[in-house]
Amino acid sequence: MKKGVLLNADISAVISRLGHTDQIVIGDAGLPIPATTTRIDLALTRGVPGFLQVVDVVTQEMQVENAYLAEEIVKNNPQLHEALLVLLTQLEQRQENQIALRYISHEAFKEQTKQSRAVIRSGECSPFANIILGSGVTF
């Protein structure tokens, strides 16, 4: 049995295949997922698993260089936005790097998901609880 924090085989496989600048998306239950993109559906019921919980576990396995958020999260989901910023700051400290954070419109965000290797769907049911994570290198 795997000893690490991340036990989901599909997510683990996607992360192990990421190269520098490849992207994955962690989304809420309502984020549209392009038909051509790998879907990893974790949603069990409303709020389970939560968005931040999924981001926390995934980023313990993935080296993150940059991230995209929908700019709408700032006004429409300020508590989640603040919690996510704390999580990203902690990740920067663990990784000993700076994560470039970019805000784009939700429409542009949805377009950008088409470039990702996978979309991980959480059970989160709050507005704009989505992030695109760009893969970095560990050296």
Swiss-Prot record:
Gene Ontology biological-process entries: D-ribose catabolic process
Origin organism lineage: Bacteria, Pseudomonadati, Pseudomonadota, Gammaproteobacteria, Enterobacterales
Active site: H20
Family of this protein: Belongs to the RbsD / FucU family. RbsD subfamily.
InterPro entries xref list: D-ribose_pyranase, RbsD-like_sf, RbsD_FucU
Chief place of localization: cytoplasm
Assembly: Homodecamer.
NCBIfam families: PRK11797.1
Domain of life, source organism: Bacteria
Catalytic reaction(s) noted: beta-D-ribopyranose = beta-D-ribofuranose
Pathway: Carbohydrate metabolism; D-ribose degradation; D-ribose 5-phosphate from beta-D-ribopyranose: step 1/2
Protein name according to UniProt: D-ribose pyranase
